[in-house]
Regions:
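Short beta-strand/loop element within the Bergerat-fold HATPase_c
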Residues: 77-89
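Conserved glycine-rich
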Residues: 143-144
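Short conserved segments within the C-terminal catalytic ATPase subdomain
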Residues: 36-46
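Short conserved segment of the HATPase_c
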Residues: 102-116
C-alpha cells in the first residue's frame, strides 16, 4: 500500500514525453500476469496496436492494473481481452472480461481510493483498493478519460481514451 501511495503522490513529476507502442507493452503485461491467469484458468487475448506519447511506466501501470483486476475478479476459466484502437488523435484501450459485473450504483465509485465493490473477494486477492484510483489518476494526467463502458453478469468492459499527442495537461475530470 505504501508503494502505491508513493506512486500516486509522485505522478505529477513524471515526464510524459516518451513514444509508446502498446502491443509489445501488452504482451509484457500478459507475461507478468501469466502466473495469476494460469492459476485461475483465465485466457488473455490482445487485439490491435497503437502509438502514443506519454509516460511508458505510467501507461504500463494503467494497463496492468486494469488487466490484473479483469483476471482477479473473473470467473474460473474466463477470458480477458485487451483491445487497442488507434484513431487520428485518440487511442482507445478497452479491457473486457467475463466476470460477474459491476453493479450500476458502483460504476463511478470504483475509481475512488480505497473503494471495494466486494470486500470479501478483495481480501482473497490482496490489495487495498487503489488500483483503479491509480488508473484514473494516470488517465487524467495524460489528458484522457476512463469509464465503465458496459457491465452485466456476463462481464465488464472498461474503456480508456487517451490523446496520442505530446505531453498534455491533466484533464481535470471529476469522479465524485
Amino acid at each position: 500500500m505504501t508503494r502505491t501511495l508513493l506512486e500516486m503522490s509522485n505522478l505529477q513529476q513524471v515526464a510524459r514525453n516518451e513514444r509508446i507502442q502498446l502491443a509489445p507493452m501488452i504482451e509484457e503485461i500478459f507475461t507478468d500476469l501469466a502466473p495469476l491467469s494460469d492459476k485461475l484458468g483465465v485466457t488473455l487475448t490482445a487485439e490491435g496496436d497503437g502509438i502514443m506519447t506519454g509516460s511508458d511506466a505510467l501507461i504500463y501501470r494503467l494497463i496492468f492494473n486494469l488487466t490484473e483486476n479483469a483476471v482477479k475478479y473473473n470467473r474460473p476459466g474466463g477470458s480477458v481481452w485487451v483491445r487497442v484502437t488507434q484513431k487520428t488523435e485518440k487511442l482507445l484501450i478497452c479491457v473486457s472480461d467475463t466476470g460477474y459485473g459491476i453493479p450500476e450504483e458502483y460504476r463511478r465509485s470504483i475509481f475512488q481510493p480505497f473503494f471495494r465493490v466486494d470486500k470479501s473477494r478483495s481480501r482473497e486477492y490482496g490489495g487495498v483498493g487503489l488500483g483503479l484510483s491509480l488508473v484514473w489518476e494516470i488517465t487524467n494526467l495524460h489528458g484522457g478519460c476512463v469509464r465503465v463502458e458496459e457491465s452485466s453478469d456476463k462481464g465488464t468492459t472498461i474503456a480508456v481514451e487517451l490523446p496520442t499527442g505530446a505531453e498534455t495537461e491533466p484533464s481535470g475530470a471529476d469522479i465524485s
